[in-house]
């Protein structure tokens, strides 16, 4: 199930160095697993992610979704930090309780210029989805060296 171009440890090191405000283990983000065309990412619980009503905010879930997609793309094509989100569509299905979230991303298309992924978000330890998303990433042209 692996064949990833970068390991979880390599990705955590690179993301921490290049995007220290976005990716920070102190904020509870960790890459649990990567494989070619996918990953599993955990976002620890923090009270600032709550919205009125005591549930995790949509903003927090969208950020986790985008991060999982980025990690799946990088794990599959290697370190190409200029890959960018071109579309993200999310459906909020259930209210997540105030605890950690896990996002599993599976790339359903991986081309030379575009990657399309499906992301399932669950509360840690639960089977039922709290959100489901699809996303598209554009990759810069790579030189033919």
Predicted features and spans:
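Hot-dog-fold acyl-thioester-processing enzymes
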Residues: 44-68
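Hydrophobic beta-strand-centered segment that forms part of the acyl-chain substrate-binding groove
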Residues: 71-102, 107
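A generic structural signal for short beta-strands and their flanking turns/coil linkers
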Residues: 27, 37-39, 58, 82-88, ...
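HotDog/MaoC-like acyl-thioester-processing domains
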Residues: 2-6, 96-98, 102, 108-145
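A conserved beta-turn-beta hairpin within the catalytic core of GNAT-like acetyltransferases
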Residues: 50, 80-82, 113-115
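Hydrophobic residues in beta-strands and at strand termini
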Residues: 43-45, 92, 139
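Non-catalytic linker/capping segments at the edges of enzyme domains
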Residues: 1-42, 47
